Amino acid sequence: MLIEIPNVFSKQEVNQLREQLDARTWIDGNQTSGMMASTRKRNQQLDKDDPVALQIGELIMARLLAHPLFVSAALPLQFYPPLFNRYQGGDTFGYHIDNAIRSTSDGMVRTDLSATLFLSELNAYEGGELVIQDTYGQQSIKLAAGSLVLYPSTSLHQVTPVTSGERTSAFMWLQSMVRDEGQRRLLFQLDQSIQTLTAQQAAEQELFNLTGVYHNLLRRWSEL
């Protein structure tokens, strides 16, 4: 399941974030790569311990945890804190699958879901599409600044070469309360239907019943 979430941050907010990020020292992006991915990757990143990156990462996580669509789709349990990368001058990241387990200061995170938050305007660069192969085929993603795409970490994906301009983004992984992607999809579809019926003021008893089904399935499938 691939979910696009527009306007997580406003254009003004993105500009403020970029002013802070652009002023930092950028390093070789292979510090987060596995052995195979490192041969396919050419970009720059901020150090994971950069204080500004950490501060903005906390802001991103807080914003996402307050976003109903993100929470409904991801059912987040634990984040691997956001990192920041930059592509320019032909930089690219060939096809790869993200590492299954990531280590944090608080322990280990199973990477169920990956997310990219775009921080460059669409007209600021050429190329740089995030191409994701999933059960529905190949999808090419290039979103407006401030928008985010969420997709299963099991997906084969790449960033195509940036032929001009500069593509800056935040990227992150998270462990979901529900490990199985198919179960998460069913819960998401059910939750979205409940929200739609609530807005349409559907019969109260039917909403109670559907909500009960949702929570009982979540109770059955979740791992905490």
From Swiss-Prot:
One of its GO terms (molecular function) is 2-oxoglutarate-dependent dioxygenase activity. Residues 78-176 form the Fe2OG dioxygenase domain. Binds 1 Fe(2+) ion per subunit. The keyword GTP-binding does not apply. Gene3D superfamilies: q2cbj1_9rhob like domain, Rabenosyn, Rab binding domain. The keyword ATP-binding does not apply. Keywords: Dioxygenase, Iron, Metal-binding, Oxidoreductase, Vitamin C. Its EC number is 1.14.11.-. It holds the Pfam family PKHD_C. Transmembrane segments: none annotated. 2-oxoglutarate binds at R167. HAMAP family: Hydroxyl_YbiX. This is PKHD-type hydroxylase SO_3913.
